[in-house]
Amino acid sequence: MRLMLPLLALGWGAISASAQWSIFAEKLPTPGHWATYQIEGVKPNEPASLTTIRLSVRNEGTITGKPYVWLSIEPIAWLGSKEKAPLRFLLPQNLDRAGANKLLESAAEIVFSNPVKGAYHMLPEDVTSLSDKVGFKTTNSLEADNPNAELIKLGEKSWTCNRLKMECFTVIDPPFVKKQTIIIRGTVWKDDTIPFGVVQAKWSEKSIKGDKVNEEQKVLTLTGFGKETAPAQALERGDRFSIWKLLFNR
């Protein structure tokens, strides 16, 4: 187990860097809606990186009398995977902001559809167990930052947005491994007339591990949105999550 912990901490650290996904989870749109975003990342003394992600929603049905949907984000890496693939969270469709700020805890199930190793799913107890093993703790917040609406212009289109302050503090402190602290601070501009609500977001990510500090600035910008026919077939969940499979067959 001692040899496992550095690998587990590395993978769980990647999850904390994706804490910004919680800004999309509040009051999800109806199944079939989608949106695309460009993410620009800038690190000191390195060229800027550009990536594109797509969010979508598909129906799951009811759980304990409440409507649940799958929030899909793709393509992204998960738990240290070499491959990028769709990552899906099974969430209440009417999830409030408090629930969205606790995205991992709010998910009834998480599915990572690895195209090479195959899909696998995590249940809440799997998330809790893995968090305990690596000493993972995180807090997210999204709060109003300006009582007045702001105009955000993207190309030929202008959006009337509410500005919110985003903060995330994460600690990963497993035995035998140096503690890592990850701090995300930024601003989100939201317009609730579009799917997922987010028009633009800008934030800084700082990772502190011992005397090593890494920083990156990111800008996420809406590039498109719409509605399509949601898939009718059941989602392929694959095998249940296993630490051994994660470490030796990922």
Language-model features, listed with the residues they occupy:
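Acidic, serine/threonine-rich low-complexity disordered tracts
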Residues: 20-106, 113-114, 118-250
